[in-house]
Amino acid sequence: FTTGDATAEERPLAVLLDCEFWAQSMPVWPALTSLTHRRQLPPAVYVLIDAIDTTHRANELPCNADFWLAVQQELLPQVKAIAPFSDRADRTVVAGQSFGGLSALYAGLHWPERFGCVLSQSGSYWWPHRGGHQEGELLEQLKTGEVSAEGLRIVLEAGVREPMIMQANQALYAQLHPLKESIFWRQVDGGHDALCWRGGLMQGLIDLWQPLFHDRS
């Protein structure tokens, strides 16, 4: 899906996980088109990736290197042949919810040269230790210095009515806080709620791509 008019090779790219949700259950096309016309979002290319089913989703999204290698080496070149986009990391957003939020940050931390902007909503940062009694894998990697968020722009959003996820997101935000100029933290009055996610997705894209408007001015 593409929006607006711009030099094709300069268009930013957004990779949205859970295609079937954003394409069918709660379509984002009208909002993306409207925000682009109002110059709140730049003309862009949007790639929506289908989770297939819950089993595939649970296997492919949580911190799965093979999944993201396939996206970069197989999927994106095919997309680019149809709808050219920029290769710049600072123009590329990867966005997801729950396991998708975890996956989005995983992609940014492990391939920052490709995915420079992360939009995580209700990210499952407890993974793989459900219950909240042990730190999740990504937080452990950040604390040990195995990965770094330096240079990334990150939106973190979680709801007050999802306590385990909120706790994990707060711990992650505390770890990322030294990078506060490039971290957007939002605590919403909701739970694991698609209605909250839709509005947060739009605002997150606006926040992450705002510097592009300054680049063009």
Predicted regions and their residues:
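Non-catalytic cap/lid and distal C-terminal segments of serine-dependent acyl enzymes
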Residues: 1-217
